[in-house]
């Protein structure tokens, strides 16, 4: 099982896409071998190029830290992969399932502008309907029931792996977000309870603590701050 890194949510999004890049390498390697065994030269060559592409993306995110560029290219490559193979093998080959899987992953995009993930989601949806309306019959001789069943099973497994991975990382991301909020809340409470100049409890904190005390078993002692005059003269 994948273990979430102990970092903030942005680091976790980067972690998600590093794993997704590795998944892309494995997936396209399987397709390249399968297409080679079935003697389909064009899709075999395409998937070999895709393996090299994902290796390049892995280097881009690990060495150059260009996560936004890598994520954009990965989503565009997915659309290109699905479109090419749907045109070659027909709609019934079910390559469109990858569009469904990737559309659910766009909300882990490392972009500063919040609308960009929705743009990629719309591109996946648009590609889905355009392929459905315009592509039915395959270009390659792939209309045999056995071959279509093999492609359907492989594509279904690949798409469900992506969807299950999204479900897992969504849960882990929610945990990270919750931990970050708790830490932020603790920091804010600490800032609210202490005077920023003296480092001592401020009036509101003292009033809150006094209200929590049992009046019959509590004592209040008041003292002066030795360097209060220095603080007052320095900061006003």
Name what the model sees in each region.
Residues 219:
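Cell-envelope/extracellular polymer assembly enzymes that use nucleotide-activated donors
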Residues 206-216:
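Alpha-helix C-terminal capping segments
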Residues 24-35, 54, 60-61, 72-97, ...:
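Hydrophobic transmembrane alpha-helices
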Residues 1-70, 169:
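N-terminal juxtamembrane segment and adjoining first transmembrane helix
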Residues 186-208, 223-236:
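Conserved nucleotide-binding and Mg2+-coordinating catalytic segments in signaling enzymes
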Residues 157-185:
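Juxtamembrane or sensor-core-proximal signal-transducing alpha helices
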Residues 48-53, 95-102, 154-158:
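Membrane-embedded alpha-helical segments of multi-pass membrane proteins
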């Amino acid at each position: 099982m994948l273990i979430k890194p102990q970092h903030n949510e942005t680091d976790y999004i980067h972690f998600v896409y590093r794993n997704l890049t590795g998944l892309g390498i494995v997936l396209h390697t399987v397709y390249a071998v399968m297409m080679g065994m079935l003697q389909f030269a064009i899709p075999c060559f395409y998937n070999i190029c895709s393996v090299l592409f994902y290796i390049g993306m892995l280097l881009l995110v690990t060495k150059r830290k260009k996560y936004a560029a890598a994520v954009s290219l990965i989503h565009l490559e997915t659309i290109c992969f699905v479109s090419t193979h749907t045109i070659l093998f027909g709609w019934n080959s079910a390559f469109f399932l990858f569009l469904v899987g990737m559309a659910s992953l766009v909300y882990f995009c490392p972009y500063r502008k919040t609308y960009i993930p929705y743009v990629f989601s719309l591109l996946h949806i648009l590609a889905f309907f355009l392929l459905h309306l315009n592509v039915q019959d395959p270009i390659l001789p792939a209309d045999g029931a056995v071959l279509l069943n093999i492609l359907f099973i492989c594509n279904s497994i690949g798409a469900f792996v992506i969807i299950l991975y999204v479900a897992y990382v969504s849960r882990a991301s929610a945990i990270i977000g919750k931990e970050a909020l708790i830490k932020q809340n603790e920091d804010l409470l600490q800032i609210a309870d202490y005077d920023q100049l003296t480092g001592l409890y401020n009036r509101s904190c003292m009033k809150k603590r006094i209200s929590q005390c049992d009046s019959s078993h509590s004592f209040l002692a008041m003292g002066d701050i030795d360097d209060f005059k220095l603080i007052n003269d320095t900061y006003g």
